[in-house]
Amino acid sequence: MSNAKTLYEKVYDAHVAVAAKGETPILYIDRHLVHEVTSPQAFDGLREKGRNVRQVGKTFATMDHNVSTQTKDINASGEMARIQMETLSKNCEEFGVTLYDLNHKYQGIVHVMGPELGITLPGMTIVCGDSHTATHGAFGSLAFGIGTSEVEHVLATQTLKQARAKTMKIEVKGKVTEGITAKDIVLAIIGKTTAAGGTGYVVEFCGEAITDLTMEGRMTVCNMAIELGAKAGLIAPDATTFDYITGRKFSPQGEDLTAAIEYWSSLKTDDDAKFDAVVSLDASEIKPQVTWGTNPGQVIAIDQPIPAPESFSDPVEKVSAEKALAYMGLEAGKSLTDYNVDKVFVGSCTNSRIEDIRAAAAVAKGNKVAAHVQALIVPGSEQVKAQAEKEGLDIIFKEAGFEWRLPGCSMCLAMNNDRLGPQERCASTSNRNFEGRQGRDGRTHLVSPAMAAAAAIAGHFVDIRTITEKA
């Protein structure tokens, strides 16, 4: 029998601490990222049982979900938000956990902060009480979201019971055409697999179109692995990964880095390893993507008509499409370019890094936001914000009529003051278009940063390729 392993199996096997017969294996956890929303009860549990945080040096906290993006005032997002942030401060102080709070230069969205500081490294197991923890899989680490009781377990033991998942390979063959981004690639993938196609699997993304991506692009792809139902998404580390890691705050240095890279280079799927499922896409066929429905799998290319419910053979999908069109206020057969947007949001753990901000700024430069549109640019961290301002991108946005905000999760989820009103339509670079996700009865369309910025200027959805062709 072959001993060949997939990347996921290599990382998983390297972290099995206890594997008792008939029991779910216990994995050692290398990094635990913490935020204000899913941690209060976990710390309470430690207190009740008289336990400490087992590995404070491997635990990092920040405030992101309900922070205001207009002020550093802790009271700005309401009573619940204030209590959660104050509680996180007290808990981190009491238990000795590193916290990047509202006024810290490293504060930011947890999945932006980890990689940019070198906290995230290849071959690690990484958990966080947040479903988009898969983002860190871009480094060839096994990263996934956990619930609050599991947060407590990891704080107390630095381990977690975790069953072995099935494996899926998603290969994006060839090169993408001009103007196609990581967001378009991952939305096209989810359009093919559906929002449940990856359930029960850990996915490895590969192929030329994936390895061509920068680390920030790879993070966008892995961030949305959860949106096809997968437990986690990984990309094998390579020279692009090692270059990104080098010189960051918590990255290994000197001989330690050389030794680490030698090990990290072994973190790839063996040639004769078998996957439980394989999905492939032709990169050259991927066009700019826009979601039309209420899950990320309900997505089309910008030049395709909105699908009719009767075009779906699966009765469940048909009913889902009918409900989605009614909720979204869309008519089958029409083009998404026929619909005006009310708000535009560039941000979230999917698309708030410096390359995303640059892409939006390139479209915004010399243009003006349509009169009826409110457009928000929300950098993913203080570090991203500082870099963007150093490059003068904030000036470009302000001159074009965009709002330049402070870092946070912002309009991705209605847990702070940035939200949609009923029936407001939003072009959003976030990762979820569920009913009410951005505000009660709000209508979310997921797009790339360039597509979002273009919609802000036109006042409706446009094909970014028509703009870049003119330029």
UniProtKB/Swiss-Prot annotation:
A Pfam family it matches: Aconitase
Disulfide bond positions: none
Cofactors: [4Fe-4S] cluster
Residues bound to [4Fe-4S] cluster: C349, C409, C412
GO terms for MF: 3-isopropylmalate dehydratase activity; 4 iron, 4 sulfur cluster binding; metal ion binding
SUPFAM superfamilies, per database record: Aconitase iron-sulfur domain
Function statement: Catalyzes the isomerization between 2-isopropylmalate and 3-isopropylmalate, via the formation of 2-isopropylmaleate.
Protein family: Belongs to the aconitase/IPM isomerase family. LeuC type 1 subfamily.
Name this protein carries in UniProt: 3-isopropylmalate dehydratase large subunit
Originating organism: Aliivibrio salmonicida (strain LFI1238)
